[in-house]
């Protein structure tokens, strides 16, 4: 048979004529020359698709998205073009803060309809699995609402994309907690995270570990609590300043350190 290609082996292209890809239970079980004619009962056991003249590709996995949110931030694009930094836009009420306000003012139907549109676009581009994050509520009600929207879309019998949900309550410090970041971390751990876990709304917990947002110590405390509650870990790490988020991800055996 054929084993997986790794490293420089992936540069080698193997062309097979009259080839077959067999899939059983959602798992690729054979790739190689067509061997169907020589096997008794082969045609009775499998569905057959003639892909002559076509290209068969694995579905893309988009492992970091924020596709459930309210509002738009198109005007910020021009600000960035003029050289304004991500953090300065956020400090004057733009960025995440702007989207939080719009998301809090959206209901389930509005958020679901918008998110479903994004998923359809992803599907057309070949995405079959997507990780989706909350993080535009920054309060208990809206964080849970975002995650419930994702669960609803994932349970839809007509869905085009599989969804893996991540709780990102520590995406930013909300206006009502400015200057009290430790209190906000306590609120997430004591009030929001248990509800996420009890309702089985997420598989992962993420945190924006960044200067001016959540420190290494605050991120460690939040992620340790998440791990103790049974959530796997992710981090937004070292996006703007090399704070040490990647090292924290390694320390806590996180699944990923993004950005």
Task: Show where each model-derived region lies.
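Metal-coordinating catalytic core of metallo-dependent amide/deamination hydrolases
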Residues: 99-115, 120, 128-244
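Divalent metal-coordination and catalytic microenvironments
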Residues: 21, 26, 53, 64, ...
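Short loop/helix-cap segments at secondary-structure boundaries that form the rim of catalytic
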Residues: 34-44, 156, 249-251
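N-terminal metal-binding scaffold of metallo-dependent hydrolase/deaminase domains
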Residues: 1-42
């Amino acid at each position: 048979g054929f084993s997986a290609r790794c490293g420089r082996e992936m540069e080698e292209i193997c062309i097979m004529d009259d080839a077959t890809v067999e899939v059983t239970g959602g798992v690729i079980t054979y790739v190689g020359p067509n061997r169907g004619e020589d096997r008794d009962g082969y045609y009775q056991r499998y569905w057959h698709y003639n892909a002559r003249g076509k290209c068969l590709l694995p579905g893309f996995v988009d492992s970091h998205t924020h596709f459930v949110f309210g509002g738009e931030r198109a005007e910020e694009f021009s600000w960035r073009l003029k050289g304004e930094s991500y953090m300065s836009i956020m400090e004057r009420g733009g960025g995440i803060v702007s989207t939080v306000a719009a998301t809090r003012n959206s209901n389930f139907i509005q958020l679901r309809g918008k998110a479903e549109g994004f998923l359809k676009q992803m599907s057309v581009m070949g995405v079959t699995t997507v990780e989706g994050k909350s993080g535009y509520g920054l309060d208990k009600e809206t964080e849970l609402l975002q995650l419930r929207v994702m669960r609803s879309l994932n349970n839809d019998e007509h869905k085009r994309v599989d969804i893996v949900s991540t709780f990102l309550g520590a995406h930013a410090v909300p206006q009502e907690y400015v200057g009290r970041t430790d209190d906000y971390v306590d609120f997430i751990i004591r009030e929001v995270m248990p509800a996420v876990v009890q309702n089985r709304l997420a598989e992962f917990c993420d945190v924006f570990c960044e200067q001016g947002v959540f420190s290494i110590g605050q991120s460690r405390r939040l992620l340790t609590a998440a791990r103790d509650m049974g959530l796997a870990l992710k981090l937004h790490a070292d996006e703007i300043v090399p704070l040490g988020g990647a090292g924290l991800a390694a320390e806590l055996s996180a699944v990923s350190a993004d950005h």
